[in-house]
């Protein structure tokens, strides 16, 4: 069993993009909770925290297919590099806006921009596997590996 995983991870670039995908997936699952805990901790308001987190997650759900389509048309690096940079800036500004007690509307704007700039990392990595491997058996093994990575 492990032989098959070693075989696909030995392919050129496979270990690098698979590990990058693993690291990139980690914060996605807990970011909504992190927003709630941070904002509640700073402001004392679960209501504000929940609304800001909801804005982030709803915008993420609405824009995910748009980002996926752009990636399909223009390529991963062309689309994702500016999106990741924008995401980091938006989340940083969200933190600053809450911590420095800026106008709450800006917090919603930064949450929306942060949510709008989240790519589907699992899909991006699986797409790379589809282009890298040559046999259906290897592809099945690669997707199995990615399923395990999704659960970590």
Task: List each model region and its residues.
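Helix-loop boundary and gating motifs at the non-cytosolic
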Residues: 2-61
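Hydrophobic core of transmembrane alpha-helices in multi-pass small-molecule transporters
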Residues: 22, 103-121
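Small/hydrophobic positions within alpha-helical transmembrane segments
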Residues: 23, 55, 59, 86, ...
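Intracellular juxtamembrane helix-capping segments at the cytosolic ends
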Residues: 35, 119-134
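Loop-to-transmembrane helix entry/capping segments in MFS-fold secondary transporters
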Residues: 46-47, 134-147
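Helix-to-loop junctions at the C-terminal end of transmembrane segments
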Residues: 62-76
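C-terminal ends and interior cores of transmembrane alpha-helices
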Residues: 85-102
């Amino acid at each position: 069993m492990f032989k098959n995983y070693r075989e696909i991870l030995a392919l050129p670039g496979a270990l690098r993009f698979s590990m990058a995908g693993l690291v990139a997936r980690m914060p996605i699952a807990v970011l909504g909770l992190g927003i709630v805990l941070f904002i509640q901790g700073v402001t004392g308001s679960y209501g504000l925290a929940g609304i800001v987190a909801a804005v982030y997650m709803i915008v993420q759900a609405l824009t995910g297919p748009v980002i996926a389509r752009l990636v399909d048309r223009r390529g991963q690096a062309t689309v994702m590099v500016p999106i990741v940079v924008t995401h980091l800036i938006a989340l940083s500004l969200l933190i600053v806006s809450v911590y420095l007690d800026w106008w709450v509307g800006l917090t919603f704007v930064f949450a929306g921009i942060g949510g709008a700039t989240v790519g589907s990392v699992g899909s991006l990595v699986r797409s790379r596997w589809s282009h890298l491997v040559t046999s259906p058996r290897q592809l099945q093994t690669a997707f199995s590996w990615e399923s395990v990575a999704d659960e970590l």
